[in-house]
């Protein structure tokens, strides 16, 4: 995927860069695999904001992605590679031998006409899905299950890639994109290869309006709020936060404070925390 940079025609294009969308071959999605999407704008069932800075954005259709890859033993052919407004990764439409069509995440290097397979003993090639127990050490994978049959939950973003570094007993040891080293059951399914659109992180938004198109509202610093609205607020003029450490709007320590519960069931499966934790 290429990145297109703009010249400074306006202040908004001065540092703007976007994807060239050169791998996309179809503009309209498969109708039977889409549905309308009610955007909650960060509100819960009572209308109270539970996730700040969300709202607006362009209207979208939701594409139903096959994260389970449960068409076992049936060859599928790549029909098209499409844009998905709900994620950074591209998606590709698969047509199976029985006529069924499904969307999957687009693996890097896969092109139209290629065949993929989901099976216990599928070949080790990009796009194929099989259990971790049948993959050799050093295999690069994505769309990894954490519970057998639940569907892929890890390494699904654009450019995401994980690696099998060891196997022992019923667990495989994986190095995840975040740098975390974790144990996963060998019966869990994963897809070979790396998620496509690897340059997604190299794009520069360029202007605030681009974030609004994506449904992201402005973030206001706590230090410029009133004391009633944020622990950092108040004071005369440009004042410091007046605290020993930064706090969230609800008074909890932040910016470096670990927030993960020590009593999570999966704590014993994490051998090394992620890099920024």
Swiss-Prot record:
Alphabetical UniProt keywords: Chloroplast, Plastid, Ribonucleoprotein, Ribosomal protein
A Gene Ontology term for the protein's cellular component: mitochondrial large ribosomal subunit
Keyword field contains Heme: no
Record GO terms (molecular function): rRNA binding; structural constituent of ribosome; transferase activity
Biological process, per Gene Ontology: mitochondrial translation
Record InterPro entries: NA-bd_OB-fold, Rib_uL2_dom2, Ribosomal_uL2, Ribosomal_uL2_bac/org-type, Ribosomal_uL2_C, Ribosomal_uL2_CS, Ribosomal_uL2_dom3, Ribosomal_uL2_RNA-bd_dom
Keyword GTP-binding assigned: no
Pfam families: Ribosomal_L2, Ribosomal_L2_C
Region called Disordered, residue ranges: 24-57, 226-266
UniProt-annotated location(s): Plastid, Chloroplast
Classification via HAMAP family: Ribosomal_uL2_B
Subunit architecture: Part of the 50S ribosomal subunit.
Family: Belongs to the universal ribosomal protein uL2 family.
Protein's name in the database: Large ribosomal subunit protein uL2c
Gene behind this protein: rpl2
């Amino acid at each position: 995927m290429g990145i297109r940079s703009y010249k400074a025609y306006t202040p908004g294009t001065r540092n703007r860069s976007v994807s060239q969308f050169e791998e996309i071959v179809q503009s309209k999605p498969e109708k039977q695999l889409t549905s309308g999407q009610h955007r909650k704008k960060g509100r819960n069932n009572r209308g109270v904001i539970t996730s700040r800075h969300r709202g607006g954005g362009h209207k979208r259709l939701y594409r139903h992605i096959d994260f389970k890859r449960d068409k076992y033993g049936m060859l599928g052919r790549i029909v098209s590679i499409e844009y998905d407004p709900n994620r950074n990764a591209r998606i590709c439409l698969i047509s199976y031998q029985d006529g069924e069509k499904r969307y999957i995440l687009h693996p890097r290097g896969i092109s139209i006409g290629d065949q993929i397979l989901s099976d216990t003993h599928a070949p080790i090639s990009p796009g194929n899905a099989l259990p971790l127990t049948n993959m050799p050490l050093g295999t690069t994978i994505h769309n990894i299950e954490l519970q057998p049959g639940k569907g892929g939950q890890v390494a699904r973003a654009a450019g995401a890639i994980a690696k099998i570094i060891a196997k022992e007993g019923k667990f495989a040891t994986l190095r995840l994109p975040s740098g975390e080293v974790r144990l996963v059951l060998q019966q869990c399914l994963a897809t070979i290869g790396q998620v496509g659109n690897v340059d997604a992180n190299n794009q520069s938004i360029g202007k605030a309006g681009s974030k609004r198109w994506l449904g992201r509202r402005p973030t206001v610093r706590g230090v410029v709020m009133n004391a009633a609205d944020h622990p950092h607020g108040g004071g005369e003029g440009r004042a410091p936060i007046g605290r020993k450490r930064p706090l969230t709007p609800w008074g909890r320590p932040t910016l470096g404070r670990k927030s993960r519960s020590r009593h999570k069931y999966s704590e014993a499966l994490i051998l090394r925390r992620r890099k920024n934790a």
